[in-house]
């Protein structure tokens, strides 16, 4: 039996489209995925505060989405990491049972942003 591809779900397709739009609308001249960070969490507001503290500034163009499952959120995260979005080196910093939210923000905004 063939395994289902989480990226084929309506939820994943919708979130991918929304993230692409978010990135496109908040990129100067062209999309540079390496200027963006993508991650998953079970508490978007707590995670946003963590990034704010770590980077000493508000995450630019922050947006989070409810992927409805960890499997879907991980698949979307991997999809965008493969496109060049930034990630941390330590995979596994998420709650394997509850991290159904995916979030993105512009890690390296330009002076024109």
What residue spans do the PLM features occupy?
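GIY-YIG nuclease catalytic motif and its immediate N-terminal context
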Residues: 1-113
């Amino acid at each position: 039996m063939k395994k289902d591809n989480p990226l084929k779900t309506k939820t994943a397709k919708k979130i991918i489209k929304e993230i692409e739009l978010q990135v496109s609308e908040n990129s100067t001249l062209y999309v540079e995925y390496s200027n963006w960070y993508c991650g998953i969490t079970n508490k978007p507001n707590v995670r946003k505060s963590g990034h704010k503290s770590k980077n000493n500034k508000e995450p630019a163009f922050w947006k989070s989405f409810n992927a409805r499952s960890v499997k879907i959120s991980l698949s979307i995260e991997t999809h965008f990491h493969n496109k060049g979005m930034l990630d941390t080196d330590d995979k596994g910093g998420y709650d394997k049972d509850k991290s159904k939210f995916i979030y993105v923000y512009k890690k390296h905004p330009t002076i024109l942003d």
